[in-house]
Amino acid sequence: MQTRKEKIISLFLVLIFLASCGTQELLPGASETPKAAPTAGAPLPTFTPTPQGFSTPILYGPNPDAFPANVNPLTGLQVKDPDLLRTPAMMLSISHFPVAARPQAGLSFAPWIFEFSITEGATRFLGVFYGEFPEPEIPIAGDCAVRRDPFAQTSTLLGNRIWWDENANGIQEDYEKGIGGICVNLYDAAGQLLQETTSDSNGYYGFNVEPGMYTVEYKIPAWLKFTEKNIGNEDKDSDADPLARRAEADVQSTLLYLDAGLVLSEETNPSVNGVAPPPAEVGPIRSGRLLYIDIHNFFPNSCFVFASASPQILPTLPQCYLVPHDEASGGAMIAIQKLKDLAEENRESRSGNFTYASNVFSETPPAGGWVANRIDVYVAYRNQSAFVYDPLSGSYWRYVDDTTQENAGVLHAEIDRLNGRQLQFENIIVLEVEQEVFEYQGQPIPALLDAYLELGGGGFATLFRDGMKYDIRWSLEAREYEQETGQARPIYFTDADGNPVPLKPGQTWLFVSTPYSFVTNQMDGSWNVRFIPPEGSK
């Protein structure tokens, strides 16, 4: 059987090194500096709880018939337009180097993002865009400072999300956005102000409390008002009284469903007058890599967009559209309208069915595991990143460096250029994948790596979700569904016995590592991922 190298020739990216990683500065901890004053002396309403039910916990997959028609099989979440699930994925090769590429535009819209080595200490992203197109946004925000740090839990949690009720139905849909910069005040049962905080860029707020009765007050601008309260299930409704602007809670254990939905009032929002949204484009886009061949094979009918590639491999890559190469700005951008047009053209030109339903999604985490509140990823001295767990959103906030020698290991929270929102991911997966230097006509090319994510393959992996770490397996072996239909499906995850390991509903970041890299427990709730490149690579 021919190896991939032979096929391409025939056609024409340790613990002992951690001492050199630099001092990492991360800031998990609430920085609560609201600017709106609490309502002094205002009488608190009488607490009269209304019993409500809760949504059935999500459990979907792995086969297509186990996903509702309006649920994205790559996230386990509802989509706004289910018809887009009939459009194959758009796969964008997105630059991470040079630093001019950052912050990238569109990453918060991608259900999956692969990060992989392109040698010389640099990494690149492959964004999987499916079920929703990116859109530029000037986020709706309150009058207070947006909270920019993950929440640090020290006691029982009370809080959760302030969101934009786009369809004004009083129900929090999966695709509706959060509202940052809302000041939130916490009162005890006697009406005494205890704490103040603000919502983060994705709308989450919270307090560390002891068991007891509390009132939460939301300080919203005059151009916003509350949606109707107590519609539907407790975990998806708005709890704020539209007139009192408050919600009550009897806290006996962690309570993360005290939400507030907002809609426009009759007044005009002064903060957006004359402010233009970011350009409607995604990227920056850079060159294609050999890894795309394998990923294309398990994302059938997908459309790959990149900026050319090395001449030795370009003829073999899955080409859907090539963008002009622009190295000075970190890569060329692609207009969102062009992306939509390409997706429609690709949809119309493809024949045969496809499905990306391959994994199980569950709100209930697997049993066991180790505490994982932070993941530090070391690729090179000037390529360090981290994921910090936020218990309010149940996701990991992404942090990156600035690639400079003097600031090596100093990290900052990363946003999406399209909307200014914090990047956060519910699942972080480290894949152990065999990689080697590519050879062309018998000569190694140290700047090109070949990573083997081939159909029929498998290997070890690490899953981080819900602030926990799990040892799992990745697999591309054909299951009964593939054997009966002949259709390939995306990479999936199991335990050591081959049982499905559920992903958490939401976005997934996949780091393509090597079998000789390290995932090390720092014994303080944090983990280090140390990438070791293949022998002979740059």
Language-model-derived ranges and their functions:
Residues E166-G180, D188-Y204, N208:
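Short, acidic Ser/Thr/Gly-rich low-complexity loop/linker segments typical of extracellular
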Residues T154-I171, C183, D259:
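A short, Gly/Thr-enriched small/hydrophobic beta-strand-prone motif that recurs across taxa
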Residues Q2-I9:
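Bacterial N-terminal signal peptides that target proteins for export
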Residues E25-F47:
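Short, low-complexity, disordered segments immediately C-terminal to signal peptides
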Residues A19-S20:
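C-terminal motif of bacterial Sec signal peptides marking the signal peptidase cleavage site
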Residues Y214-V216:
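A short tyrosine-centered beta-strand micro-motif
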Residues E210, I220-E266:
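Structured interaction patches on ligand/partner-binding surfaces of diverse proteins
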Residues G53-F114, T119-T154, S265-K538:
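A surface/extracellular/periplasmic glyco- and lipid-processing/surface-interacting theme
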